[in-house]
Amino acid sequence: MSSNVLPMYASTPSRAFAHSKLSSQLRAALADNSPAAPISPAPSGSALSLDESSGISDRDVHSSQEQTAHLSEVDVKSIHSSDSEDEPAQNPLPEVPANCGPPTIPLNVLLDFAIQHVYHEITVLAELMQRKTNDQGEQERKMSLVHFAHATRSQFLKLVALVKWIRISKRMDVCYSIDYLLDLQSQYFIDTADRLVAMTRGDLELARLPEYHIAPAIDVLVLGTYNRMPSKIKEAFIPPAKITPREQKLVTSRLNQLIESRLSRLSSGIPPNIKEIHINNGLATLLVPGEFEIKITLLGETEMTKWTLLNIKILVEDYELGMGLPLVHPLQLNQLHGVLQSRMNVSLNPIKEAFSFLHSFCVSLQLDVLFCQTSRLAAGRLRDNITIEKYDPKERVLVVGYWVKRSKSRRLTVGQVKCDAQYRVQIYEDPNDKLGGLKVRHFPHAPQLGRLDSGAGMLSIDRLLSETYVVRCKERLMRLRRILEAAEPRLEVKMTGISAPSLSLALLPDTSSKDEMMTVSVNSFCGKVLCNVHILSAEHEDVLAFGKALYSSQCSAHTIQMYLRKLRVALVIERYRRSVKALPVREVQEAELLPFAKECLGDAPAQRIILQFLRSEDYYLLVTFSPDEKAVVKTHIQLLEVVGDRAQFIQLEDDEMNGMHVKEAINQGTMRFSPSHKTSLQEECSREQRLAFAVATVEDRITYMYLAAELMKKGIGVDVRKDSAHVPGGLALHITDVKNVVPFEASEFFECCIRCCLRLDNRNRYTFQFEMCFENIPLVRDVPHGLPHRRDGEPKDRTSKDATWLQELNHINQSSPEKLVELIIHRLMRYLYMYKVVHQFSLAYEKHFKNYCNIEAYTFHKLVVSYGDNRDMLMILAFNVKSQAPGSSEDFFFLNFGQSMPHRQFNSTEIDWHQKPRWNPHSMMSQLMRDDLKETNDLVFTMHFLCETIRPLVAIGNFSRIRFQSQKSLSQLIGPDVHFPFRLKYHLYALDQTTLRLMQGNVILEIKLLEGCKIAVRDVSRYRPRCAGLFQLFSNIDSETTAIMNDEIAIPQSDNPQTAGPTMWTPEQFMDSLDERPEEIDPRMAITSQPILMSHDTIIKACDFKDTEGRITCPLDEYLCSISYLQRALLTLERMSPRATLNKNSSSNLSCGFVTIIDAKPDFIRFRASQMNGDGVNATSMVHYKIYLCPVAMTLKIRIEFEEGTNSAATADNLKTLTTYFEKVVFPCGDEYALQSYICLTRLTSFEATQSIANLMNVQMEHPPTSKCCVQLSLTYNNTSTKKLAPATKVDQPLQNIIFNVIVSQSRTSESFSVLRFIYRIKENFVVVPSANEKNKQMADEVNAETKTSGGNPIWNLVRLVMDRFNSGDWNPGNRDEPIISSVAPPTYVNPGSVAGPSSVAAPGSVSIQQPGSVLQPGSMMGPQSVNALQYGMHRQPMGGPQSMQMNPSSVGQPGSVGGPGSHQQHMMNPGSVGPGSVGGPGSVNPGSVGYPQWNPPSVGQSYHHPLHHQQYPPQ
């Protein structure tokens, strides 16, 4: 050990010498004040050591660039003089490594940072100064320049100071070396200390002197040999031999034999408490249940071998006291183990000694556990209820007292309370029976008291007390039962409950509910007697006092009887309180009464309740209670009236209180009063129910008194009495005389009225029933279905009707008597007025009207009559009384109309719910008929009018169903945008009972209902008639009954003639002077304002809507649509005239061509247009058109004529195809842009194009249902981006290129379709497909090559090729091409002066022009919009066009639901709102609200319109 340590100590002087040497070097370096050596520049430039706190270095620079090394190395040679050239001395300080010095940054990098910062500030300042131009900005600019100059100067001054500091910075290098040297020495000391600690704890721990082996040394010295080796060596390297399992089994078996033998010899001395002895594996386990368990064994075979105690287990447990741990600590158990082992070693009977020792310990432990449990209960849950009277661990006695009574005595000190336990329990160990364990003794003794189970191990004082409490409670209850039965022999006392016993007492003889039973129980914790009656409050004074009396030791029979009488009265009072809760009374306290009212209560018994009537607050019901031997509790009721400062009792009649004979009142819920001579059955009704009946009777009597007074004030005679025995309801207020309130003679009505009374029903709600009984009713139900209304066996022609009860309930809560009287009078007036008109009608009904109508119901306040051919129309008549005075002008009849199922379908098993919808057209004039009935009171005339006019009105009423007509195209043509471009197609309204007006645009038809089943129709359009051929329309239907009346009725003038609308168009407005002869006027299309007389059948046929080729229409509808279409077509053609088209200087070259209007009449329009034959704008050949109203079919047709020799393809078949296409597609479509596209198509004549167009139209019209390819011409284009409509077929201004759009699909109803778009070169006769699809281009090339070779026109060839490939699957609907029209909306025109465009305000005459791109310009035909079904309005229509937005009549309701004249939808919804030149034309609601645009010539320099002068449009 010394040899290893000495070298370490030997090196210490050298380290001390080195340390002293370094200290001298430090002192020499610090004393050296010579300047540093000159700085040698580094390759990367000058470097400077910067401190982080200098404020010049930037942290961002450190994070982005690596730190550089020192500018120059520390010169190790000291220079004594700058001019000396001698060899310098060596520096004693060590060199600082590169990474151990402070961080540095190159000076050039620092300068670059400063320059970049200044440049950035200058740039930002220059940008900000440009925005400051005012005077304030000039001042801010100057201040910004000053701040910038000051900041820049300060920054560069810091750099100058830094550069100057570099000259002397070399002196700081010495400090860096000193710092590094000190850190190095400190690390040496730390390493030395760590090494010494490691050696001390590791290597030197076993460096001690060994023990000297004397015996081997003697052997070696004496014998010269080494004979003995230490046993530690053997134990360390040679393990002991293990015993085998067989040997283990033999050993344990032998031990078991030895233990059995020894125990058998000791068996006579083994205590009997040891219940179990188990011998196994050489061990004997002895168990004393509930106390302990020990394990013993023998460690030898000799008789002298002592028993060895291996383990002791204490079985006494209490988890609450031990908090989950054993009660005996392991250290205590080890001590017990040692003491018991020593006692067993010296004992003659070790087994008995072990039992005696451990048994004594366990008994003491059990008693201590019980004491701890009792202490917890006394301090916790059973505080003040149990007490520990004695506890002696030596004597092993524990005495616990329970049911403690606390009392004060004069002998005690003030504040002290004496606690006396009524019962005690003693837990002890019997000295004479040491083996018996703990025993229990109760004071006083009783059977079946609680015991301790010592064998359980877990003793519980709580269980012992609980078992004891149950027995003690039963004892006390049995004693109380004997006391109660002795005090009240008739009182029935029952013992109930098993785990919680109690006594049940029936205080009243009729008590059957458990809530009214008194329950007497004993509190098991404190032993107090508890009394409870559920129906009474838990804090009831008498109940608590009775319980205290039973608990006290001084409880006499008289005291018990007194409390029982009080409780019976309290129970009856509570019964009464509960019985009147649902009645209109409330209980009041005596303190709430006035002083003079309290004086009246002086003689009344103290047990009483006071009930105040809610509806009659001046009346109080006083109910007093007093004990009685016979009735148990006697009640007395008095009525107290408090009026002003006076209070008095009112004597109640006997029939109100005791004379009510109740029978089956409870079971049936109604009161049936038996005759007065029969005996009363009050025993069937309990006492509180009789009180409720009495309160209700008194309340009824008071209410009737008030009502009778109010009725007598009105002059109505009344009588309050009961009805006969067979009439339920009790008291009733009978009305005997109403002559003073009836404004007319009503003797017949009162002869039919048997009884009129008012009853009060307060069972569930406080309601009044106005009851009237009639006989000889004028009208009864006589419909052919339903229940019969005459008795069997009576003749059908019997004049007297059955007696009928009519009872109507008025659910009026808290109503005042004045309101009830008013309602009674109103009800009588309603019956009287209804009876007046019904009685008069009943006389005519039996003679005449029963063949034309049926009575559905007559209930004296309402009459329901069904009429019509099918009896499916209902007339509902009622009378409403609104005024206070009977017979006032404010009263009126309610006349409503409805519908029902036809009578023939009531008994039918099959009902067609999909028939044409029915609505009652008389609802249009219900107000007019109501006013007439109010003036005349003549129901006979009203029913005559309804029966006579129902057939024609049902037909005419078809026009009142809501059907919208699109005005989007027309509004775009006129100019101003309309947000809701729809209008009602028709508007039907009634002027009076016999006059109707039907409006459709500018056309107004007046329909007169005449007698003799005749109808008169005339044209009453404003200013002049406009219906050409109106007589011819009805004459075509029935020429025999149709005639023109000679008397011409003047047309009413407009309310505002200046702005009401145009008169009628003249040829000068829309056409130039032409050298053409006008056609002769057809006399059948004459215009007249004379009424046209016809029969009902004629007007029904004219208005009968039917499904014709997919369109639901009728002759009159088709005629009016034609008249309206002619007016709209004239506007469309005027927009196609040269005057309304942009001039040639405009950049737009998409149009529908020019047309010239030749002649315009109400029944036709003639115009012409140049042919598109390849000559362009220089073409001289014309196409002549005539759109006219056919006098035979009374629908629109068109005639097309080409000049002779100009179109070889204009054959009769092709012309018929063109005209048929107009009739089936263009006209039903109703779209103005479709007409423009149609005209553009029919003008194309180059290279027999007419034949191709006719083929296309034929394919569309004659599409077979089985075909898999459906081809349709698209006439209208819907731009989804601009939401505008436009013609789908357009031509450029030079008339050289025309656009075609053809829709190809599998069927007309197919959801997927494709659009074939191509441009036809009119002059070159070839087609171009501007598409990115190579297949389409290839098809166009093939068609052009074929056309060039064989001649003909490529339009039909291309379409036919597409159809063939579509059928073969090469061209399918999924391959949708891109749209080729980017903007096809027409140019917008000037907004009218009074209507501004949406979201803009433009001056009158201003023009907003939209310039669509050229056809050949890139992007002008290819738009980004995707093609969908909304872009092509012609798709999936029966013949390619929509049905004018018309709806199925089955989907609409009654007229007027959208808005008639006067509604707020002026130019959107009102009929006639779209007229020439204005969205709100003639027929709109406010004619002066919408003006018309002024078409004035443009000023110089403007080129928006044609230079021709236009007159004001339209003319006023």
Curated annotation (Swiss-Prot):
Query: What is the first-listed, main subcellular location in coarse terms?
Result: nucleus
Specify whether Transferase is a keyword of the entry. no
For this protein, the record's Pfam families field holds: Med14, Rgr-1_C, RM2_Med14, RM3_Med14
Q: What are the UniProt keywords, alphabetically?
A: Activator, Nucleus, Transcription, Transcription regulation
Q: Where is the composition biased (Basic and acidic residues)?
A: 72-83
Compositionally skewed regions (Gly residues) per UniProt: 1474-1483
One GO cellular component assignment for this chain's record is:
mediator complex
Tagged with keyword Transcription regulation: yes
Subcellular location per the Swiss-Prot or TrEMBL entry = Nucleus
Q: Using the UniProt annotation, give all residue ranges assigned to the region (Disordered).
A: 22-98, 1434-1516
Q: Where is there biased composition of kind Low complexity?
A: 34-47, 1463-1473, 1502-1516
Which Gene Ontology biological process is one annotated for this entry? regulation of transcription by RNA polymerase II
Quaternary structure and partners? Component of the Mediator complex.
Q: Would you identify the family this protein belongs to, as annotated?
A: Belongs to the Mediator complex subunit 14 family.
Describe its function. Component of the Mediator complex, a coactivator involved in the regulated transcription of nearly all RNA polymerase II-dependent genes. Mediator functions as a bridge to convey information from gene-specific regulatory proteins to the basal RNA polymerase II transcription machinery. Mediator is recruited to promoters by direct interactions with regulatory proteins and serves as a scaffold for the assembly of a functional preinitiation complex with RNA polymerase II and the general transcription factors.
Q: What is this protein called?
A: Mediator of RNA polymerase II transcription subunit 14
Query: Which species is this record about?
Result: Caenorhabditis elegans
